[in-house]
């Protein structure tokens, strides 16, 4: 069944995010400290939405769009209008296609909502502060360094924060690595099959669709959110969307992507562990994962 509540969160988050990015990058970029504090506040607010539950998609969409757009808009060669229009266009198309497919291929039986996790105030504060702080550090690193070709590394660091606690981040990072490796191996196979005919869309689309279909099925069967299938979907999308051009060497891109994602995950997990230990020193932000 098509969920209007989810669809509204999806589109509203994209629209609000575009306005925020214009204000942050357009007006606050000349004051880096103030800009960083505003970004931190937005991250904490969005991870708090995710931790509380009902507005999870609003928060998660905001985190992903904020991280991606802040990275691209920091480069002078980026066209803001194209970036924001593409963001809104993609969100509207995703909702419209989802509604269409729900109508054409309805569920056989009603879906049961996942059980809601009861969280105390200390756990919510722990999760929002931990994830918000680490996401802000990632933002600062990508603002200082020239990492415009490391979108997968950026997304890997952000997406493993979605469990919002240390143990969940460790498990998520393992799934992420496996998904990235599987997708990169598939892309290498496509490179061998297509060779230098990648500019022929009629040859590429069936292979891209096959890879996405397999990854989507794996994602649905896992039932764990951002697992192996989800990591594979995002990797295929990024690789084919950004790097598949005529005579582009996807072998180097594959190896670079695996290396950059691994480094990003190790650094992010280290930061998550340190923040987890620090926040657990205070009763107001203490969270101990129970077995």
Sequence positions of predicted segments:
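Alpha-helical transmembrane segments and their membrane-interface boundaries
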Residues: 1-57, 71-208, 215-291
């Amino acid at each position: 069944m098509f969920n209007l509540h989810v669809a509204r969160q999806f589109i509203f988050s994209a629209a609000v995010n575009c306005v925020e990015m214009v204000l942050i990058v357009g007006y606050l970029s000349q004051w880096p400290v103030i800009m960083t504090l505003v970004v931190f506040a937005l991250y904490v607010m969005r991870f708090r939405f995710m931790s509380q539950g009902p507005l999870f998609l609003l928060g998660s969409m905001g985190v992903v769009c904020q991280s991606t757009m802040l990275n691209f808009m920091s480069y002078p060669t980026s066209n803001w209008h194209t970036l924001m229009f593409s963001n809104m266009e993609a969100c509207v198309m995703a909702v419209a296609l989802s509604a269409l497919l729900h109508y054409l291929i309805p569920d056989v039986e009603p879906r049961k909502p996942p059980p809601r996790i009861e969280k105390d105030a200390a756990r919510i504060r722990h999760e929002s502060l931990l994830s918000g702080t680490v996401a802000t550090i990632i933002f600062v690193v990508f603002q200082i360094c020239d990492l415009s070709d490391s979108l997968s590394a950026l997304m890997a660091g952000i997406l493993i924060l979605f469990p919002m606690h240390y143990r969940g981040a460790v498990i998520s990072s393992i799934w992420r690595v496996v998904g990235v490796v599987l997708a990169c191996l598939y892309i290498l196979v496509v490179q061998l099959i297509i060779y230098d005919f990648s500019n022929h869309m009629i040859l590429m689309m069936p292979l891209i669709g096959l890879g996405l279909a397999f990854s989507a099925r794996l994602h649905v069967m896992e039932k764990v959110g951002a697992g192996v299938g989800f990591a594979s979907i995002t990797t295929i999308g990024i690789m084919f969307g950004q790097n598949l051009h005529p005579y582009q060497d996807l072998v180097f891109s594959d190896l670079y992507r695996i290396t950059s994602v691994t480094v990003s995950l190790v650094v992010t997990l280290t930061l998550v562990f340190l923040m987890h230990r620090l926040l657990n020193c205070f009763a107001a932000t203490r969270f101990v994962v129970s077995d």
